[in-house]
Amino acid sequence: KEVGQRLAAGPGNGHYGALSVWVQSFARPRMEFIVGPGAFSPPPKVDSAVLSFEPLPPDQRPERPDLLALVIKVCFQQRRKQLGSIARRCPLAPWLSAAIEQAGITPTLRPEQLTVADFQHISRFGASLLDNPLKN
């Protein structure tokens, strides 16, 4: 059940994190229903959940999953810090700071406040900066 909550959580929810952003970049997860311990033998000490995943259309999925994974990892390693601070302390700072700015995201926000689309915008702008370094 807890994993299902993490997968389906949105920004601002205590369960929202790197796993939420990654999964929701490729599919729409939904908790269908809770299954009590009595449905299993031996019964576990926790409730379980049945989840469904609706794949996103290809044009809504990340163009550079490798870069998205890197942005998510860097941001959620310091989830209580502001994005501007994370970018300044990160070895990727030259392009990460610029990508955050170009994506129009406020650098005083924290990772758990960003939407999945925000993370995708950052990685998309990061890809364009890396592919065209002279435009920096």
PLM region spans:
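Class I S-adenosyl-L-methionine
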Residues: 1-111, 121-136
